[in-house]
Regions:
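Membrane-interfacial helical/loop segments at transmembrane boundaries in membrane proteins
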Residues: 56-66, 189-198, 390-403, 473-499, ...
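Membrane-interface and transmembrane segments of multi-pass membrane proteins
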Residues: 444-585, 706-711, 719-734, 774-809
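Cytosolic juxtamembrane amphipathic/interface segments immediately preceding
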Residues: 66-70, 354-357, 439-446, 494-496, ...
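Transmembrane helix-loop-helix hairpins at membrane boundaries of multipass inner-membrane proteins
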Residues: 1-2, 15-111, 180-203, 207, ...
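Alpha-helical transmembrane segments
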Residues: 83-84, 130-136, 167-170, 204-216, ...
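Flexible extramembrane loops and terminal tails that flank transmembrane helices
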Residues: 602-611, 623, 677-832, 837-841, ...
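Hydrophobic transmembrane alpha-helices and their helix-loop junctions in integral membrane proteins
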Residues: 91-132, 141-449, 587, 600-603, ...
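Short aromatic-rich membrane-water interface segments that cap or initiate transmembrane helices
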Residues: 61-80, 196-210, 399-411, 494-502, ...
Length: 963
């Protein structure tokens, strides 16, 4: 299987999972499990090509002129992470099948899980630095959705937002660092960057680049001082925690450090920043974990500590330490995933995760207890388990480090202290829960979980045992393949033997185990007695509080800046904007020779001059009437827009004219819907004061100056000869390469299709934002009543005996005739939209114009028939139109990649149909179909959000409570 297919498979599975019915629990889990299983098998089959330092590489051309191609690259390190992502992902899917409640929206869960798996695979397999950052940000996005999966819970929403803000900010720093790194190396290709270590380290921008990259890595892997988000992410379902916070998301940061280790390591800056952050995180996480009373929070802080251990190893500037870091990435993923699953089983079967309430579970859950105790022993570094081996390598590296004397003395002590803490919190997880008398006040009667729910824990704990007892046979080959790309050359000598003799690392292990037991016994009495409620000495240090204070300070600064520089009046904002424009233009032209060009002028037609006089009159009249008569102002704005439309026709630009006309109609409808809910204007007090008159004169002068200045600049530019035009390029290539004769449409859906896809994505985001803002909007009381023209007349009040109404109610059938006419217009407009869409590649039209026509036809039904009638007869599903449109656009682009062409390359097929004859069907037709769908969905979503105000209750007036 090609790497590109391997990368695309989870995303395809995610889309399919999202489309399955809500109650298809078994189908969802089976689909997700098959996708993960196929991926893990395919990744495993690729190992023979990578075992001796080989690299598998696929490159798909995208923007070769700027060095941006889709590069999928797998070496030993990427293979190891891909195995963890897919292997543990498959186990998590099986576990989640039994963990998730029948009331949970399972399609959404498995869709997000597969999408996150695809994002992690994309990041791991990226062979281009910008591409890596893109997938890096995707992991932040999908982790946000997974952490906040139970969005009805406030802690889940807070934890998801915190994780997104912290990791998203780090991602922006990483993006800046990637740009600098690519600038220094001369390429964003990972192979080029990995070979440019000496150049990068000697460059003046090395320190800045290093700090930016490390900010991205530290925020993702919860390194001090960005560690606080991980415990709050425990509000996620336990399968999410077992996947994201053991083997995938939190490993992204240390993976980045390992990936760029040959390029950035080996300097004093690397040693002190990376090593210092890792050491602080190691000690802080381990110490804090001992005091936690929630199972998942204990595991979260222990994860922080182990991530700090890996970071510290990578920061020691030692090849052997880098090998140990890679080894611990593998070991930590296995025992921590099993511990999270065991914690989830305990929570699932007892109804609580509070260690203070859980006792004696070994009596009722002996198998689960045994598995959890073995995994916690691996976490503590007990011999004959995998955690012991990498911990011994860590101890050895701290003992034999060559640095400053105080570092050589203090680092082994700190490592031993962290080991003591690890044993203590591991005992809290195991002994406190499974021994002592059985708790009797649990929310549920505890018992063993379903057999298949426990199978993932069985397999992971078995891996801990096998690796711990037979490391060279079971994992040595994989470790060598994964570590070789990290060290960037020949591997250092090391041994994975269980016994290395009685040496300094062994003494440190004995001290850690013995000291951990003592600390646990001392701590247990005080925790049970309630004498300790928070970590000693550092209880005042609360990362969450610091985070919230930082956000509050930023919000305060923004509010004060808004009060100082901002205004809620549009007139003041426009005054500042236009004043700055005039001043900037004047400054740029000051002292320069400003003159008209020498191009010959076209004789002006009296008809054209009359047309623009009408347009100018409409614009001026709209400005005059906007304050007094809104409907008249709207009519005059439409008159100015119609003049612009006819101007395009005059200059033989039918596509622009058609688009302008459709946009004018949509804009008019938008204004009509919006003006309905504006409060009535308060009559102006007369006479007008001198201050008001002065302000209006100032605004008039600025408006005239701005308008005349823009006209003068435009005239000066248009009367000068144009530089070399790009028009011949498109005119000669549109038909042979784009398969159409309409240059404008082919330009949009072929030559510049990626820009168009970005634009419809922005349009979709804007529509969803407007909908979200208007969803909770309530019109003021004074706008709820119908206008006088629509109110009931006396004859209605007399004759309507079935539904008696008062004079303020809506008149019976006041829009009956227009409603009938507009309903008859709907099918005609839809046929017209289809006609415009189908002819767009060769004649005036296209998906954008067709979408606007269809949208206007539907929204007119709302205007004349009302919201309730339309939605009782039509099921619009506006958001699905947007989603389907974006999906069409993306699939069209990926289809070109599948055939070896650049993204969104158009292919034209010649078909011969009976009766119709020969036709040509360009693949851009499907892209244009996506544009049509997004335009329909976005336009209807925005306009119907306004239309829905008519069926909502009013809000109180701002002056309703005034005496």
């Amino acid at each position: 299987m090609a790497l590109s297919v391997l990368l695309a498979l989870p995303f395809i599975g995610s889309v399919i999972a999202a489309l399955l019915p809500t109650n298809a629990r078994n189908a969802e889990s089976t689909l997700a499990g098959l996708v993960a299983l196929i991926c893990v098998v395919q990744v495993a089959l690729l190992f023979p090509a990578l075992g001796n330092g080989g690299v598998i590489r696929e490159e798909i051309l995208w923007l070769p002129s700027v060095g941006l191609n889709l590069v999928i690259r797998m070496d030993g390190l990427a293979w190891m992470l891909a195995m963890l992502v897919t292997g543990i992902g498959a186990l998590v899917v099986l576990y989640a099948r039994y963990y998730m409640s029948p009331a949970d929206p399972v399609p959404r869960f498995f869709s997000f899980l597969l999408a996150f798996m695809g994002a992690m695979m994309g990041m791991v397999l990226s062979g281009n630095l910008i591409q890596l950052v893109f997938f890096w940000e995707l992991t932040s996005l999908f982790s946000f959705l997974l952490i906040g999966y139970w969005h009805h819970r406030a802690d889940a929403r807070r934890g998801a937002r915190m994780a997104l803000i912290v990791t998203g900010a780090g991602g922006l720093c990483l993006f800046a660092g990637a740009l600098l790194l690519g600038h220094i190396a001369g390429s964003y290709d990972l192979d080029v960057i990995l070979a440019s270590g000496a150049i990068v380290r000697a460059h003046p921008l090395y320190t800045v680049t290093l700090v930016l990259v490390l900010l991205g890595a530290f925020t993702k892997s919860a390194q001090f001082p960005f560690h606080f988000w991980l415990p709050h992410a425990m509000a996620a379902p336990t399968p999410v925690s077992a996947y994201l916070h053991s083997a995938t998301m939190v490993k992204a940061g240390v993976f980045l450090l390992a990936r760029l280790w040959p390029v950035l390591s080996g300097t004093e800056q690397w040693f002190w920043i990376v090593g210092g952050a890792g050491l602080c995180t190691l000690l802080l996480g381990a110490y804090t974990a001992m005091f936690q009373n929630d199972l998942k929070r204990l595991l979260a802080y222990s994860t922080i500590s182990h991530l700090g251990l890996i970071t510290l190893l990578l920061g020691l500037n030692s090849s052997l330490a880098a090998v140990a870091a890679v080894f611990h990435i593998m070991n930590h993923a296995t025992f921590k995933a099993s511990l999270f699953m065991a914690a989830g089983i305990i929570d699932h079967e007892t109804g609580t995760r509070d260690i203070r309430r859980l006792n004696g579970l070994f009596k009722v859950m002996p198998i689960t207890a045994t598995l959890a105790m073995v995994a916690s022993a691996a976490m503590a570094g007990v011999p004959l388990l995998n955690g012991f081996l990498s911990k011994e390598m860590f101890f050895a590296e701290t003992v034999y480090i060559s640095s400053l004397p105080w570092v050589e003395f203090g680092l082994p002590l700190a490592a031993t202290l962290a080991g003591i803490f690890a044993v203590a919190y591991s005992l809290r997880f195991s002994y406190d829960i499974f021994f002592d008398p059985l708790s009797t006040d649990l929310p549920r009667r505890p018992h063993e979980p379903p057999r298949w729910m426990r199978v993932p824990v069985d397999l992971l704990v078995l891996a801990c045992l096998v690796v711990g007892m037979f490391p060279e046979i079971s994992i040595g080959w994989a470790l060598r393949a994964a570590a070789l790309p990290v060290v960037g050359g020949q591997l250092p000598e090391y041994s994975l033997s269980v016994w290395h003799g009685f040496n300094a690392p062994m003494i440190m292990s004995v001290v850690a185990i013995g000291g951990g037991i003592v600390v646990y016994l001392w701590l247990r009495k005080r925790l049970e007695g309630g004498r300790i409620e928070r970590p000693l000495l550092i209880g005042f240090f609360d990362g969450k509080r610091m985070y919230e204070r930082t956000l509050a300070a930023a919000n305060l600064v923004a509010r004060r800046a808004l009060l100082l520089f901002g205004t809620h009046r549009l007139q003041s904002q426009l005054f500042v904007l236009m004043s700055l424009t005039v001043l900037g233009t004047t400054f740029a032209l000051w002292g320069r020779d400003f003159s008209w060009g020498e191009r010959p002028l076209i004789p002006i037609s009296p008809m054209f001059a009359t047309l623009w006089l009408v347009g100018m009159a409409g614009a001026i009249g709209a400005a005059w009437q906007a304050k007094y008569h809104r409907l008249a102002a709207l009519t005059m704005i439409a008159m100015a827009g119609l003049a612009t439309c006819l101007t395009f026709v005059w200059f033989s630009a039918p596509d622009l004219a058609l688009t302008q006309l459709a946009v004018e109609v949509v804009t008019t409808v938008l204004f009509l819907l919006g003006l309905r809910w504006l409060p009535k204007r308060i009559p102006l007090e007369l006479p007008i004061t001198a201050q008001t008159l002065l302000r209006r004169s100032r605004d008039l002068a600025l408006a005239v100056l701005s308008g005349c200045g823009m006209a003068a600049l435009a005239y000066a530019m248009l009367t000068r000869p144009f530089p070399q035009s790009i028009s011949p390029y498109f005119l000669t290539r549109t038909l042979p390469e784009g398969g159409g004769t309409n240059v404008v449409n082919v330009l949009l859906v072929d030559f510049r299709s990626f820009d168009t896809m970005a634009e419809i994505t922005v349009l979709a985001a804007v529509a969803l934002t407007v909908y979200a803002l208007l969803r909770r909007f309530r019109p003021p009381r004074e706008t709820v009543q119908s206008p006088p023209q629509q109110r009931a007349l006396p004859p209605d009040l007399i004759t309507d005996l079935i539904n008696p109404r008062i004079a303020r109610d809506t008149a019976l059938g006041f829009m009956l005739v227009p409603a009938v006419l507009v309903r008859l217009l709907l099918p005609i407009a839809i046929v017209l939209a289809i006609y415009l869409f189908m002819r767009g590649h060769n004649e005036s039209g296209g998906g954008f114009v067709a979408g606007l026509v269809a949208s206007v036809a539907v929204i007119l039904q709302y205007i004349v028939a009302g919201t309730q009638w339309v939605e009782a007869h039509m099921e619009l599903r506006r958001s699905r139109w947007i989603a389907i449109g974006l999906l069409f656009a993306v699939i069209t682009g990926l289809g070109a990649l599948a055939f070896g062409y650049p993204f969104l390359t158009t292919h034209t097929a010649q078909l011969h149909l009976p009766v119709i004859g020969e036709i040509h069907v360009p693949s851009a037709l499907f892209f244009d179909m996506g544009v049509f769908s997004v335009v329909v969905g976005a336009t209807l979503l925005i306009l119907t959000a306004l239309a829905h105000q008519s069926v909502r209750s009013h809000r109180e007036s701002a002056h309703s409570g005034a005496p």
